[in-house]
Amino acid sequence: MKTINYAAQGLAVFGLAALPLAVHAQASSDDQASPTVELNPMVVTAALAPRTADQSLSSVTVIDEAALRRQDPASITDVLRGQPGVDVTTQGNFGKQSSVFIRGTGSNANVLLIDGIRLRSATTGAASWEFLDPRMFDRAEIVRGPRGSLYGADAVGGVVQLFTPEGEEGSPQPRISVGGGSFETQRYSASLSGAEDGTRYHFAASRFDTEGAPVRRDGDDKGHDNTTGLVRLSHTFDSGAEIGMLALRSKGSTEFDASGPAEDDFVQQVAGIYTELPLTERWTSRLTLSEARDERDTLAPTYSSLFETRTRTAQWKNTLALGQHEVVVGAEYSEDDLGDSQTSGLAFNEESRDNRAVFAQGLLDFQPLTTQLSLRHDDNQAFGEELTGSLALGYELDARHSLRASFGTAFRAPTFNELYFPFVGSSNPDLEAETSETVELGIRGQYDAWFWDLAAYRTEVEDLIALDASFRPVNVNEARIRGAELSAGAEFDGWTLATALTYTDPEDRDTGNRLARRATQGLRLDIDRELGEWSLGASWIAQNHRYNDGANEQRLPGYGIVNLRAGWQLAPMWSLRATVENLTDKEYATAQGADFDLATFESIPFDYINAGRAGFVSVHFGP
């Protein structure tokens, strides 16, 4: 089989794509033309205060509403796949278990936020990305690098934050979408949003239903359905005080394969209320109360289980403006509760734990030098105290180019499965948290019509949790992750281009092997063109091979897929969109499962294959 060097291909494609960008960027600079979409967006996840992308001192990617509409993705993982530093694995197609790796760290070593509220399973430590409907969100921010000093446990590789829409000033704006396509897929969504007299509102609902496709060769179709509702309200008083609330709930089921037909019934929910008070001209105080719920009820041929997490959080954050500088201090209390979680009728040895934290951040501006300094102390009932911190420095070389350097620490909390799983000998209540240190260097160029960003990093992880010879989790391993990311984007004359190249070297220092399920090379190229009433676009996503296991014996080949999209503005309020996924009908797998042969007592691996070529069409009403 011919081996494809995806990095070499990517560099060639990047060069071809960047050539016209550079030529046009010079022309745009000369005539001061403005891009149709902001290329230097405001980012709120990289720090505890908003900053533009070139001021954030972080490696960050923003996916705005326009990009989400163009791609019209079926899942959030479709949006994240191939973004700089991001690797996604799935156990099949729609609604099947998915893992997101950021900068080579584990799927339970990154954080998912929805409008600032964290969502995850405390039993696995990871988020259920596969159950999130992308039509509920109008923006995504991906911040790469440690953020433990801002967000606490598990922010080792990075943070992904999804934002729900806010109502815009004016009369109510309805939106309706109806669509369907391959695998007997049906999608419906509707929303109503607006703002008047200081009150903003957004209401939305969606339904996704599909018969699905096989998740293994010669297997049966595995279906999925998901119903989601969203309410977001806020009011700003004449004094500047603000109150608001958010409620997002998804409920559905997904079929999968576990040595026979199996099904998950799931519920995902986030809810929160907040108040923000301008106590003085320089001091703003914000109090947030929230609850996140992740529930998965599984029925399989050989077992049944219920895993439920309720995380309740109270956070008090204070922002002080001191001239061109800014200081943030706060405190946070959270509690994880497993409720009625059990597997095969056995309950967990412990069902709850709490965490108390205090944090502080300083954003210091001494142009052309800027500094971000942060510190956080966590005291967890289960594994004790952890102190994390970070220091980032930025230097403006000129009006268009800036350098950045940072050092940060983070930790991954042991999960309830690792600490208290009910099967004898399969858990360890004496586990300590995994700890990490990361050094990063970056340089960014920001122009009128395009940008580029290059970053290199090194992460050292200690006390990595792994299974010993008796399959009991222990703190034994160390890992070293080295990598580099190159990204660029442009907007000109109706063209929108974005490209990302990723190199990651995630090594288990004890064995010298690559960490499981991580690719080392990745490429993503998005090209879109507006032609009056029409729009056309394509994405190319490619990755090299990976290993399903830590022993590096189960090799999964690399792949490259092409997705196409088109849109037609039928009337001012009506549009038609069509997408083709996996144009070349490439069969590929990013994860494996295993069957157990009772006759030979052997484990027989099989590939979780992704869906083949698929087409979808949808009609949209609204602005």
Regions found by a protein language model. Name each.
Residues 196-198, 222-337, 452:
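Outer-membrane beta-barrel domain signature, strongest for Gram-negative TonB-dependent receptors
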Residues 365-370, 452, 456-460, 475-551, ...:
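Gram-negative outer-membrane beta-barrel transporters
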Residues 148-149, 161-163, 167-171, 177-179, ...:
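Periplasmic-side early beta-strands and strand-to-turn transitions of outer-membrane beta-barrels
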Residues 1-83, 194, 227, 490:
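N-terminal Sec signal peptide and the immediately downstream disordered periplasmic leader
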Residues 260-278, 307-310, 353, 382, ...:
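Outer-membrane beta-barrel signature, preferentially recognizing the C-terminal barrel domain
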Residues 117-144:
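Short acidic/polar hinge/loop motifs at secondary-structure boundaries
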Residues 77-117, 121:
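Extracytoplasmic beta-strand/coil segments of soluble accessory domains associated
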Residues 462, 568-623:
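C-terminal beta-signal and adjacent terminal beta-strands/loops
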